[in-house]
Curated annotation (Swiss-Prot):
Protein topology in the membrane: Single-pass membrane protein
CDD domains recorded: CYP503A1-like
Taxonomic placement: Eukaryota, Fungi, Dikarya, Ascomycota, Pezizomycotina
Location relative to the cell: Membrane
Glycosylation sites: 167, 297, 428
PROSITE patterns noted in UniProt: CYTOCHROME_P450
Protein name: Cytochrome P450 monooxygenase TRI1
Signal sequence range: none
SUPFAM superfamilies, sorted: Cytochrome P450
Length: 542
């Protein structure tokens, strides 16, 4: 036991340093820890800098590099944001076979000439899904679950469903497709027989949403205004929110999403979608357990049948909306704008439609035989596709292409679409010619290649290669059905002095969202009797 002095303190207490000495010691230790922290952080930053400096880099020429002492890509991106098309055409007119790089809104991307499309089209080391979902959207943040579902499907659930069900049932879904179009066109374009202006894109987006929903989700949801509102708006809303979050450093984005009203609204859209979709699935699962369960033939049933792991049904349906509605709408808008600028093509189109329908009735064979309509749509897509560069991919490992172009792991690549307007490939390439592909299909060697749904390095409207749009056959039929009704039941024209101005930012190219057409309903129904609504109903019930 320690000895105790007269004051009552153990003698060892006097051996402790004075308070001032103790505080000095503590301060010195804190200074030491702070210095070590600074040294450690400097070491980490220096290590990352050395790692970045020494890592392999893409070797294609960079057209809009950062300037000296620039620490962000903001200026470089703004420099090219609205001039990407011209930059691509200028570069490839000088160097037709030489890749180049730009700093775009999603970072650096190497853009290849169309001549290299065949080399990369089926390369498994290049991921379309990771480039189009994980790189562009924030799949771990609430509200972006549809892109998370899409990111699972490099060659999985969604692709299987589209290939094995949607494409194989095209003939069976043609009648309900036409039935819904008959009703929807009347609702959205109206019955006014006087000339009146129609905001083209704002009218066609809900129209396409409703018609697509009829096939994907059935009759009930295609008339549900809440679902139509969510499906039509989610694509543009998610893109805006994704752009907003990209302004923040990655570690802060989740926190920002919790505080941002825009992010909360996006998450609410997904919750509302689940509130509509999940009860339908639950009811079907109950019916399935009964002896006389109802049979369904829509994408809800298809996904349930092919899902091998847990998935989010509502988010999957929203992802389908993202990849289908706005691209289909864009093609429709462009075709209507082009036809209104070339009214001489209208009567031949109407004649073809009437004659084919009288001969074949209402089926996919009839749509296939409408070669002039197919040609008109493909020509509009040729002159204004939805992107200046397509075949977006992200490298899963370091890749060196045949010409020596190096693509490091994690780098994005794409292929320029300028060949679609190349005078060396197309006669009068800059002019719209509705008969261009019609004439090509008269030559047996080009019968397949000249169809709207066909792709090649010279026409990549639906992409190209292993990741070509799997829903392009349905999209082509859907656009044709809508065009049939608009051509036979309505007249339209471009208002005097009006000229649509497509929007271009980075590699995206969209039709003018403010453009209006003048439209009027024809006085008499110009559609053959077998296409009446009553006929549809009888066919659907039989």
């Amino acid at each position: 036991m320690s000895k105790v002095d007269k004051t009552g303190y153990a003698q060892w207490v006097y051996l402790l340093p004075e308070r001032s000495s103790m505080m000095s010691f503590i301060d010195s230790m804190e200074d030491f820890r702070f210095d070590m922290l600074i040294y450690f952080l400097c070491f980490v930053v220096l290590g990352r800098a050395v790692q970045w400096f020494l890592r392999p880099k893409p070797n294609a020429p960079l057209l809009n590099p950062r300037r000296f002492f620039e620490f962000s890509d903001s200026r470089a991106v703004s420099e090219i944001l609205y001039s990407t098309r011209q930059v691509l055409e200028d570069w490839f007119s000088k160097y037709p076979t030489k890749p180049m790089r730009i700093i775009a809104d999603l970072g650096q991307i190497t853009i290849l000439p169309p001549s290299m499309a065949d080399e990369i089209k089926n390369d498994p080391r290049l991921s379309f899904i990771k480039a189009s979902t994980e790189s562009a959207f924030h799949i771990t943040i609430p509200g972006f679950e549809p892109f998370r579902e899409g990111a699972k499907n490099e060659a999985g659930l969604i692709k299987n469903v589209l290939h094995k069900h949607l494409n194989k049932t095209l003939n069976h879904i043609t009648t309900p497709l036409a039935e819904e179009t008959c009703l929807a066109v009347q609702e959205y374009f109206g019955s006014d027989q006087g000339w009146h202006k129609v905001p083209l894109r704002d009218t066609l987006v809900p129209l396409v949403t409703r018609i697509s929903t009829r096939i994907f989700l059935g009759q009930d949801l295609c008339r549900n205004q809440e679902w139509l509102r969510i499906a039509a708006s989610y694509s543009s809303t998610s893109a805006e929110v994704a752009n907003h979050l990209r302004r923040w450093p990655k570690p802060l984005r989740y926190l920002v999403s919790l505080l941002s009203p825009e992010c909360q609204n996006l998450a609410k859209q997904v919750r509302n979608a689940r509130a509509l979709i999940n009860p339908i699935l639950e009811r079907r699962r109950v019916e399935e357990g009964q002896e006389k369960g109802t049979s369904y033939n829509d994408s809800l049933e298809w996904f349930e049948r092919y899902a091998r792991e847990a998935y989010d049904p509502a988010a999957t349906q929203l992802f389908l909306s993202v990849v289908s509605i706005h691209t289909t709408t864009d093609l429709l808008c462009q075709a209507l704008e082009d036809i209104s600028s070339h009214p001489e093509i209208i009567k031949p189109l109407q004649h073809e439609i009437r004659e084919v329908l009288k001969q074949e009735g209402w089926n996919t064979k009839a749509l296939y035989k409408m070669k002039l309509l197919d040609s008109v749509l493909k020509e509009s897509q040729r002159l204004k596709p939805v992107q200046h560069a397509t075949m977006l991919r992200l490298a899963l490992e370091d890749i060196t292409l045949e010409d020596g172009t190096f693509i490091p792991k994690g780098h994005q690549i794409s292929v320029s679409c300028h060949a679609m307007r190349d005078n060396e490939i197309y006669e009068n390439a800059s002019s719209w010619d509705g008969y261009r592909y019609y004439r090509q299909r008269e030559q047996s060697a080009n019968e397949h290649k000249a169809q709207l749904s066909s792709t090649s390095p010279e026409h990549m409207g639906f992409g190209y290669g292993i990741h070509v749009c799997p829903g392009r056959f349905f999209a082509a039929n859907e656009v044709k059905v809508i065009m049939i009704y608009l051509l036979l039941q309505y007249e339209w024209r471009t208002p005097p002095g009006s000229q649509p101005k497509p929007l271009s930012w980075c590699t995206t190219w969209a039709t003018d969202p403010t453009f209006e057409l003048e439209v009027r309903r024809k006085g008499s129904d110009d559609i053959p009797v077998e296409l009446s609504h009553n006929t549809f109903s009888r066919e659907s019930e039989s």
